[in-house]
Amino acid sequence: MLACNCIEPQWPADELLMKYQYISDFFIALAYFSIPLELIYFVKKSAVFPYRWVLVQFGAFIVLCGATHLINLWTFSIHSRTVAMVMTTAKVLTAVVSCATALMLVHIIPDLLSVKTRELFLKNKAAELDREMGLIRTQEETGRHVRMLTHEIRSTLDRHTILKTTLVELGRTLALEECALWMPTRTGLELQLSYTLRQQNPVGYTVPIHLPVINQVFSSNRAVKISANSPVAKLRQLAGRHIPGEVVAVRVPLLHLSNFQINDWPELSTKRYALMVLMLPSDSARQWHVHELELVEVVADQVAVALSHAAILEESMRARDLLMEQNIALDLARREAETAIRARNDFLAVMNHEMRTPMHAIIALSSLLQETELTAEQRLMVETILRSSNLLATLINDVLDLSRLEDGSLQLEIATFNLHSVFREVHNMIKPVASIKRLSVTLNIAADLPMYAIGDEKRLMQTILNVVGNAVKFSKEGSISITAFVAKSESLRDFRAPDFFPVQSDNHFYLRVQVKDSGSGINPQDIPKLFTKFAQTQALATRNSGGSGLGLAICKRFVNLMEGHIWIESEGLGKGCTATFIVKLGFPERSNESKLPFAPKLQANHVQTNFPGLKVLVMDDNGVSRSVTKGLLAHLGCDVTAVSLIDELLHVISQEHKVVFMDVSMPGIDGYELAVRIHEKFTKRHERPVLVALTGSIDKITKENCMRVGVDGVILKPVSVDKMRSVLSELLEHRVLFEAM
């Protein structure tokens, strides 16, 4: 037998077993070869795989294992030495790779186990995230319900609608069996069932506010679970049900107590609460969840805010209604006052005109009589009539001035005037009256008193005359001194005038006038009465000298208009008085002092006494007034033509007439239209006569209307001979004369 490299089997081969081994090795090899292919495929598909070199070793191990099984197919039969060598090599390589792979797995397995741990961690994290997402969804759902409820609650500002809407929306959102609101009573000692969801409860039922369960709820700002058997939770009859639903209660802060009529509480600053009770359905396993309790708490806060807003709105509406009622009442009172003022002013205007017309006749005729040959007794009688008439005319002026001062229609006429001349004129006017009573009157003008000032000359002179006139009136003998000087800053503030706040400036100064007399004096407690209308103190009344009339009351108002104040001082009866007032006057501009619009008044010895041949026209609808004015002018030598109608005047007027006196306040006759027609007739100014309004109306509108239509002067009735003489002199010299009103 020839030698060979074959390995002889030790036991006889069983063909069936050999066949099964052969088939098994084939499929094992096939599986071993397919596994690396699958690994390679899925590794390529995977973006991240950290153990590629381990995979190479593991793939080599599997391939070599498959190769050994594949080579083993040829070992079941007689095979050559080559096959045996290949088989041996494959097994050696397989052993090496297997050992290397086993050693490598020692390092890999912990990583794989950590991967598993991370997997479990991620699963737990995912579960936690799921729970958080569920919580977030629950919170979002709660927030949605809160927004919906808040919108419904705030859709109205009626508190009853707010509370009813709250119960309905909470009942619908939380599927409640019952929901109720307990409000505090007026005494604050009980809670009253005010609103319920199902309207099946005895609204008005009360429970004591100091119950432990109520104190428990009021002491917490959270929703509190309470027993279904507590008095505030017995809202529904169980009707055979044995398991009542869970009940929670929450406090509702009452941010505005007055809206709920609980003003009888001793401490309104203490916080007070209403109680909201919510009940889940009976015979139900449902329980309150945290997010539902949070929803209830938020809604309670929103209800508190909405109730506060509603209360504020209700109060503002009540205040608005009250204000509207007050405005209506004030408007009615204002209209009534305006009607009364208009009626008073109309009455005063009519009375002024009607009284000045006869007064004009009395004074004019008395002054005419005074210039005739009279006996001493007759002259005394005429002078008495004239003085009484002048006093009555002054009183009429005072009444009208006071009326205009009170209704605010009188305004100061600001102009530049000679301040020293005002005092000298007052002194000259008062001296003859004082000399009759053997009173000496002295005038002291400080050296630093400005010669010119800016202010209302007429009102200042009227104030000085009234104050000095009172001093003369209540002094039987002795002396009267008038002192005028610039008030220093330290002497301006006075405790008697707390509302007087003088302000120093380079543009104005404060004039201080002091009138001191040695007359009857006055009790200090009677001094405030002197500035009231027709004041008459006991001391004055006993001397038959009458009261202070309107003079001081008007002076006080004039002084206030001139931003000053006035006061009177006296040490008592028989010790004389000192009247002092301060007024604000302006400085004229230094550059214009040489051009001051001031014309000194004509002195008595410079006034023309007669006007022979001066042609004058007089128009007046009142026959007495027309005759008196004509008589005055005729006494002064004028050639007078008197008419009563406009057409008659327009017919007789000519260039020969130098002056036209006309009453512009005649009933049924428009004196202003007459002035316009005269201007149309005489287009050239030097051909037109001087137009003078002789009127009894002293209002400012009359003067403005006269100036508007081109009237050259306005003279107030009554007019005496001396006044008419000075008026004509002024008109002929300046062709303009507007008497101050």
From Swiss-Prot:
GO terms for cellular component: endoplasmic reticulum membrane. It is an enzyme of class 2 (transferase). Residues 350-589 form the Histidine kinase domain. Activation probably requires a transfer of a phosphate group between a His in the transmitter domain and an Asp of the receiver domain. Homodimer; disulfide-linked. This is Ethylene receptor. Belongs to the ethylene receptor family. The modification 4-aspartylphosphate is found at residue 663. Binds 1 copper ion per dimer. Residues 615-732 form the Response regulatory domain. Residues 158-307 form the GAF domain. It comes from Malus domestica (Apple). GO terms for biological process: negative regulation of ethylene-activated signaling pathway. GO terms for molecular function: ATP binding; ethylene binding; ethylene receptor activity; metal ion binding; phosphorelay sensor kinase activity. Cu cation binds at residues 65, 69. It is a multi-pass membrane protein. May act early in the ethylene signal transduction pathway, possibly as an ethylene receptor, or as a regulator of the pathway. Its EC number is 2.7.13.3.
